[in-house]
Structures are given as C-alpha cells and as structure tokens.
C-alpha cells in the first residue's frame, strides 16, 4: 500500500514538473525582437521613421513641472526647451509616469497628456509607466490608491482594467498613442498591496497584471498594440530575476519586454548587470531594457562608504553612462534594446543625479547618447 502511495506521489510530482516546463517554454518563445516604430500623430501624414537599433531614453516626468516654474535649461550656454535639448543630443524615447490621484506629485492624466503631446511633436516615442498608486510605487511602497483601498479583489481587478483602458484611450484620442506600456513600476514585491503583494499572492498579482494588459490592449482602438513591459528592480541579481519571471510565466502573464532598474549603489556592479543580461537573454529570449538608471555628478553618500566605480564628477557620470550603453549592447542575440535615464531634469535631493548642473547647464552626460550613435 505504502509503495503504491509513494509511486502515485512520485508520478504526480513528475506531471507537475512537466506542466511547469511546458509553461516556461511557452513563455520564453520570442515574440519578435523589434521595438515597433513610432506612431505618427493623427494630424501628421508622413510615415513613421524606421526604428533605430537602440533606445536612448529618459524619464522626463518632472520636466513640465520645472519649466512651468520658469526654469530654463541650457546647452552650450544657449537656452532651449528641455525636450529639444534631449532630442538634439540623440534621445529618441521618453518615459512618462502616470498615477491615479497624485499629491503633491504632478503626474495626473492631464499633465501626462501635455507632456506626451510635446514629446510626440518632436518625434519622440513614448513609454507610459503606470504606477497604480497615488504616490511613488517601488519594492518598498506599492500602496493601493485611496479610491480603491477598500475594494475586494474582483472589484480591484475591474478598476485596474478600466483605469488602464481609459488612460490609453485618452492618449490615443489625442494622437499620442504610447508605443510601449509598463504595467506597474518596480513590481518585484508585487503591486496594489495588500491584494497583490508578493511572494504570497501570485494568483491575485497575476490577475491584476492581466487586467492592466487587457486594458492597454482594449484602449488602443484601431491603433497598433503597444508593447507590454514588466519592470523589476533587479538589474544585477539573476537569482531574484529568475524567481520573478519564472513565476510570471507559470502564472501565464503575457508580456513582450523585460524592464530592469540599474542603479550601481543598489543593484551591483556593471559586471553583475552583464551577467544578468546574458541570463535573461538566454532564458527568456525577449527584448531587455534598462528602464531606470542614474549616476551622481557630484559627491554623495549613495555608495555608503564603498568606493564608487567612477568618480562622482560630471565626467565620471558621463563615463558611467557610456560604459552602461556598451554593456547593454553586448547582450546576447541583440536583445539588449535600450537605456532610460531616470530624470535628467530634477530638483532637490535627486538633482545630483540629473543631467544638468545647478545653473541648469547641460553636463557632459547629455552628449553620450549622441556619441554612441556615431560609433
């Protein structure tokens, strides 16, 4: 009897492992490695430009707020709108975050629509970053929006779907359909806590992600479907990356692009990032983007007593970005698709990581993307 029970248990484990292997194989099949071309505004008759080999991007979610205060950005001593400076220096994508009812952060739907319109007019492609929160969303803070806080799981799933669909519809109707949509921000620990908190609630988390993905797809109307990015904060950690994306695939969450944050004081060395890029490319066979990065241009305590890999100077900052771009481009099978700098125009405590000095003059790092395109 016990032998029969053991054989039954052993056979059950074998079947479960086979199911997981099949699901993982399904998830790792390439969905096409080309990031789609920019979608022209409905008021523009010209065809979209051919997709560049590499994404040179920036999160510019604070820019409009800063310029509305009268801050003027300069390049070589000449004042220009911030977006024009970036475009002139080789940037080709912008990332915009969207929150539900942010206070005091500015990133409402209307604010983001204005940013998107200005960016698209200059030829930028758009990555829209849904936080699904009223405040910052990151692995330590994934607070459910106040208006959704008391919803049971089923209602929360509906709210995520409708909010995402309505937002994408508004962008589409304005003629600024996003090229890529990020469902959640640094969601290594889940999102919309406590309902979608990991590691304990994978099924609920998967439901929430799928609701956002369906909302993005249904909001597109007749436009091309935006690529779906899933973003975590494990640039130099292949072990946690494997845990997260393997579970995502087993839970059958469809996605197109892997996004990683990489800040060297938190996520390790460039060599650790390189190893993880190789791991992701070989295991998941999907495009990979370092969707958040930065480096200080003046002394700071970010490394907490450890020696920084580059000097914390304007030139050291530029050297870091140049080496990061090279590292991502070396990803196997051409799957390293881009880099986004997190907030080139910033104030306060994070100004030391921006691309402009205290007088709002462009630092050497602004030139790195343009130089990389000439190599």
Where in this protein do the model-derived segments appear?
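Bacterial N-terminal signal peptides
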Residues: 12-25
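Boundary/entry segment of secreted carbohydrate-active catalytic domains
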Residues: 48-79
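Hydrophobic faces of well-ordered beta-strands that scaffold small-molecule active sites
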Residues: 56-58, 94-96, 126-128, 179-183, ...
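Active-site beta-loop-alpha junctions enriched in small/polar residues
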Residues: 61-63, 99, 131-133, 183-188, ...
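Aromatic-lined substrate-binding rim segments of carbohydrate-active enzymes
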Residues: 80-137, 201-220, 224, 277, ...
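Active-site cleft segment of glycoside hydrolase catalytic domains centered on the general acid/base Glu
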Residues: 109-110, 139-248, 253, 268-277, ...
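Aromatic-lined glycan-binding groove of carbohydrate-active enzymes
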Residues: 240, 249-260, 269-270, 276-301
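Aromatic-rich peripheral "rim/lid" segments of glycoside hydrolase catalytic domains that contact
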Residues: 279, 293, 298-323, 327-375
